[in-house]
Amino acid sequence: MSFTVIIPARFASSRLPGKPLADIAGKPMIQHVFEKALQSGANRVIIATDNENVADVAKNFGAEVCMTSVNHNSGTERLAEVVEKLAIPDNEIIVNIQGDEPLIPPVIVRQVADNLAKFNVNMASLAVKIHDAEELFNPNAVKVLTDKDGYVLYFSRSVIPYDRDQFMNLQDVQKVQLADAYLRHIGIYAYRAGFIKQYVQWAPTQLENLEKLEQLRVLYNGERIHVELAKEVPAVGVDTAEDLEKVRAILAAN
C-alpha cells in the first residue's frame, strides 16, 4: 500500500513563533518530523509551508517542499492546495502529520494509513485510552466517542460520555473511576486526496466553530470517520516553549 505524508509547517505561531525551525538536538524541529515520516514507509513526504526560511531549510535536508498561501484557516485547507498544485490522484491516501510532532512514532503514521485502506471511509484517525481524570476534564484533550465498530459518533472538548452518577455532584476529580469508554483523540489523519478537495468545498459549521474542531465538519456532512486505538502512544507535541523544553529533554535522555 502506498501513501503520501503531507506535513503542514506554519512559521507564524501565537504561542511559539518560528517553531518549525526551533533547534532540537542539533536539528530543526521540522526535520525530526520529516525523518519520522520517512521511517513510516511513506512513498512520498511533502512539507507544506508558507515561509521561505522554512522552505530553504527543508530543501537543505532533502525534503520535497510545496509553498502554500499564508491565508489558510486550517491545516486541511493547506493540504487541499498541495493536492491541487501537485495534481495528486484522487484515490491516493494522504496522511496529515502536524509539523510540531517531532516525537511522533512512525508506526502510527503507517497505522492510520492502513486504517483508512481497511475501511470504507474517506477519513481515518487514531485515539488512546484516557487513564487520568484530569486529562478527561481537560478541554485541550479532545475526546472521541465511537460505535462498536470504531466509527466516530462525536468529538468534543467536553467529557463524553457523561457519567451522570459520578459527575453530577462531583467534588474531587481524583476520586473519579474511569470507564474504558473514554478515549483521547490523536490529531493525525488519513484521507483520500479527492476527499480533501471535497472537504474544503463545505462551509464551516456551527459545531466546529463552537468546539474549534474542524473534523466535526466531516460528521455534520454525513461522512464517516474510522478511529483505531494507536499501537503506540505519542509523546508530547510542541505548542509552547515549555513543550519544546520537554521534547529537548526527552531526546537528550535518549
Swiss-Prot record:
BP-aspect Gene Ontology terms: CMP-keto-3-deoxy-D-manno-octulosonic acid biosynthetic process; lipopolysaccharide biosynthetic process
Major localization listed first in the record, in broad terms: cytoplasm
Q: Which InterPro entries match?
A: Cytidylyl_trans (IPR003329), KdsB (IPR004528), Nucleotide-diphossugar_trans (IPR029044)
Provide the alphabetized UniProt keywords.
Answer: Cytoplasm, Lipopolysaccharide biosynthesis, Nucleotidyltransferase, Transferase
- Family as reported in the entry's similarity comment: Belongs to the KdsB family.
Q: Where in the cell is it found?
A: Cytoplasm
Q: Which reaction does it catalyse?
A: 3-deoxy-alpha-D-manno-oct-2-ulosonate + CTP = CMP-3-deoxy-beta-D-manno-octulosonate + diphosphate
Q: Which of the seven top EC classes does this enzyme belong to? A: transferase
Query: EC no.?
Result: 2.7.7.38
What is the name listed in the Swiss-Prot or TrEMBL entry for this protein? 3-deoxy-manno-octulosonate cytidylyltransferase
Signal peptide stretch? none
Annotated pathway: Nucleotide-sugar biosynthesis; CMP-3-deoxy-D-manno-octulosonate biosynthesis; CMP-3-deoxy-D-manno-octulosonate from 3-deoxy-D-manno-octulosonate and CTP: step 1/1; Bacterial outer membrane biogenesis; lipopolysaccharide biosynthesis
Q: Which Gene3D superfamilies match?
A: Spore Coat Polysaccharide Biosynthesis Protein SpsA, Chain A (3.90.550.10)
Q: Name one GO molecular function term.
A: 3-deoxy-manno-octulosonate cytidylyltransferase activity
* Organism for this UniProt entry: Haemophilus influenzae (strain 86-028NP)
- Function (record text): Activates KDO (a required 8-carbon sugar) for incorporation into bacterial lipopolysaccharide in Gram-negative bacteria.
Gene Ontology cellular component terms for the protein in this record: cytosol
